[in-house]
Amino acid sequence: MTRTRKSIPIIIYHTAQYAMYAYCIFAFLSLAISVCGELGMPISMGRTVLTVEHLLLQLTPIVLWAMFSLALPAETRLLRHCSEMVTICYMLTFILGLCFRSNLVTMTEDGQTPQMVTLLTRIQGAIGLLSVIASLMAGCHLVSKYKGNMHKLGIALVMVFIVWLAGSNIIPSAVFYLAGNTQQTAITCVNIIIEVSSTAVYIYAYYMMCRAINDAMQDAPNDETI
C-alpha cells in the first residue's frame, strides 16, 4: 500500500495537537491542586492520577518540541538545532527524574548525600539551564526573523524565559519586600503568582507552537509517493 507525503504533515500536526491538549488539561489540573493547597483547601487526588499528571506534564513538551523540530524546513539550521537541543535536554531531565523517583540512585548514605547524587543533581541543573538558553535563542530568532504565528511563538518563548527569570529571583524578592513581616502570606503570594504566570505562558507558548507547526506543515511538499 502506498502513502503520500501528505500523511506525514498530518501525523506531525495531529501529534502536536493532541500533546498540546493533554498538556493544557493536566497543567490546569496541576495549577488547581497547587493553588488550592496554598490556600489551605487541599484537593484529594489518587496516586495514579498524580503520577499520570506528572508524567504527561514532562512528556508532552518533549513531543511538542520534537514535532516542531520535524516541521521546520531543512534550511532553518539554527531553529532546528535549538529545538533539537531543547528536546534532548527535556528527555535527559525526564530520565534523571525517573532515576531519582524510582530509587535507582541512593539519595542518602549513612546520613550523608552521596557524591553521585550531588553530581547528578548538578548535571540536571546544567541541562535545565541549557534548555532555557536554547529556548530563548529560538525565541529571539523567531521574533527577529519571522512573522505571523512563528513571530508570536518567538514572543511566547521570550515570555517563558522572563517568567522563569522573574520566578527565580525578581518576584520572590519583591513579594517578600512588599509583604513585610507576614512571611507565610509572602510565601503563599509568591507561589501562587509564579504558578499562575508560569502555567499561562507555557500554555500560550505550546498553543502557538502547535499553530506554527500547522503553518509549517501547510508549506511542506505533499504530492510525492513513498
What are these language model-derived features?
Residues 47-62, 119-132, 187-199:
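Alpha-helical transmembrane segments of polytopic membrane proteins
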Residues 92-150:
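Membrane-proximal helix-loop-helix units in multi-pass membrane proteins
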Residues 29, 162-226:
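C-terminal transmembrane-bundle signature of multipass membrane proteins
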Residues 1-67:
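N-terminal topogenic module of multi-pass integral membrane proteins
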Residues 14-17, 21-24, 77-96, 153-166:
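Transmembrane alpha-helical segments of multi-pass membrane proteins
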Residues 3-13, 66-79, 136-154, 202-224:
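Cytosolic juxtamembrane helix at the C-terminal end of the final transmembrane segment
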Residues 37-49, 103-123, 171-193:
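Interfacial non-cytosolic loop connecting adjacent transmembrane helices
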Residues 126-141, 147-174, 197:
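Alpha-helical membrane segments in multi-pass integral membrane proteins
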